[in-house]
Amino acid sequence: KDYASDLWINTQARAVAAKTVGIKALTFNFETIQGKIYVAGITARPDLLDEMTVALKNIKGVNEIVNYVIIREKL
C-alpha cells in the first residue's frame, strides 16, 4: 500500500511542479518515501520554489517536504 501511495504522490508532485514552474520543472527530481517528498534540483527562482513547496504540501498523503534544491545566482 505504501509503495502505491508514494508512487501516486510522486506523480502528483511532478504535475504540481509542471503547473507551478512550467518547463523548468524538468530540473527537479522527486522521490516519495512514506508520504515524505524529497525534492532535489537547481533553480535561480526561489520564489517559484516556495510556491511549488506550498502546492506540494496540499497533496493528499504528504506528511513532509524535504528540500535539497540549490539556489543559484542569476547570471
Specify the residue positions occupied by each region the protein language model found.
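N-terminal targeting leaders
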Residues: K1-L75
